């Protein structure tokens, strides 16, 4: 996992890098990492998947009032992991998804990303790695 840590602050993307952010099911990218994702092509109204040089993983419902349960977030993370597997030439910088506006702790979200351990093209926040490898 050495060298596969997402920087705490991402201000620019190198060629082939994808910014992976927490979104809502309405695709309203108005705050947090979702708002930052607009800089790199996130599409207003698109909740999940590849959007420009970004990839959305919903953690809130369409109304943005309800935080999705872990079991509701899990399928979106599974889809992301499959996407990363079939796109090895892209490097995915996963942010602290679900740990900002959705108020989860890394210990809650990190286990969803265990499937990326062997994927060299996925970088996770150090807080996620600590929980996955503990």
Protein language model regions, located:
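Macrodomain-like recognition of ADP-ribose-binding/processing modules
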Residues: 1-134
């Amino acid at each position: 996992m050495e060298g596969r840590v997402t920087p705490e602050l991402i201000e620019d993307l190198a060629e082939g890098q994808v910014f992976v952010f927490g979104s809502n099911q309405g695709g309203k990218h108005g705050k947090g990492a979702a708002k930052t994702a607009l800089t790199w092509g996130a599409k207003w109204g698109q909740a999940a998947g590849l959007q420009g040089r970004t990839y959305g993983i919903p953690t809130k419902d369409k109304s943005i009032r309800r935080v999705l349960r872990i079991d509701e977030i899990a399928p979106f993370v599974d889809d992301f992991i499959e996407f990363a597997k079939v796109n090895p030439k892209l490097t995915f910088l996963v942010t602290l998804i679900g740990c900002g506006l959705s108020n989860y702790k890394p210990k809650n979200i990190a286990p969803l990303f265990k499937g990326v351990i062997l994927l060299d093209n996925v970088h996770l926040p150090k807080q996620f790695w600590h929980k996955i490898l503990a």
